[in-house]
């Protein structure tokens, strides 16, 4: 495909630096421990009804680490490295000087990394994955994301820390995004970090319809009692 206007050289250099997988190099090491939300994000990223997933949460709860873990998982599962893009807006401040940074980088990615349009890749059964980290640093991220998913076939993860700005943007993306909220570590996650065992949530194996059945609550009590000692040790 014909090359369009390139990005500023410093931005291009940062993109190559932050995506060493494009050159067959390893990225930063990530912890083996995965937060409870990882499996849900991985499923939504590939099979969710909406083309984009928005991960919201306060700072320091692991959103960036989750994005990196998802990137690693994609690569370990055999996704071609040049079908992936990791774009952390807090690490490339000069991106904010561009008129439409998300769309500008997406076009550059098509031309110089993917080697074809996002739609062509998807139609060939090789959809691209775009991981956009800390988008609250962009005032107009939502209109750009809307344009991207309306006109290009790709799977997108968006993370953000500023709840008001993320919420305002999400409202304009109805039907195009699935929102997932993540907070501080759960008690069972602390147990997983400290003792290597993280109890599965009872709701995870049950449907909300079960809540009307009294037996459901007796089973929930028994389920929680089985891991009571683990939770108490984690709390201590």
Q: What are these model-predicted stretches?
A:
Residues 2-6, 169-236:
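Interdomain motor-coupling "hinge/lid" segment immediately C-terminal to the ATP-binding subdomain
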């Amino acid at each position: 495909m014909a090359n369009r206007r390139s990005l500023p050289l410093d931005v291009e250099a940062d993109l190559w630096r932050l995506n060493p997988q494009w050159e067959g190099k390893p990225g930063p090491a990530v912890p083996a421990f995965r937060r409870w939300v990882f499996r849900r994000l991985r499923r939504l990223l590939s099979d969710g009804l909406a083309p984009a997933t928005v991960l919201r949460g306060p700072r320091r709860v692991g959103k960036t680490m989750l994005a990196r873990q998802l990137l690693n998982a994609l690569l370990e599962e055999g996704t071609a490295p040049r079908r992936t893009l990791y774009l952390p807006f807090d690490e490339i401040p000069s991106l904010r000087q561009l008129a439409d940074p998300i769309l500008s980088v997406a076009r550059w990615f098509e031309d110089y990394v993917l080697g074809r349009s996002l739609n062509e890749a998807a139609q060939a059964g090789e959809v691209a994955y775009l991981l956009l980290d800390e988008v609250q640093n962009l005032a107009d991220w939502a209109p750009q994301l809307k344009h991207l998913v309306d006109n290009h076939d790709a799977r997108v993860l968006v993370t953000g820390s500023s709840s008001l700005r993320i919420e305002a943007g999400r409202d304009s993306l109805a039907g195009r995004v699935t929102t997932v909220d993540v907070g501080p570590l759960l008690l069972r996650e602390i147990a997983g970090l400290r003792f290597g065992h993280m109890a599965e949530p009872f709701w995870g194996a049950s449907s909300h319809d079960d809540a009307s059945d009294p037996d459901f609550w007796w089973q929930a009590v028994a389920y929680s009692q089985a891991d009571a000692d683990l939770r108490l040790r984690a709390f201590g």
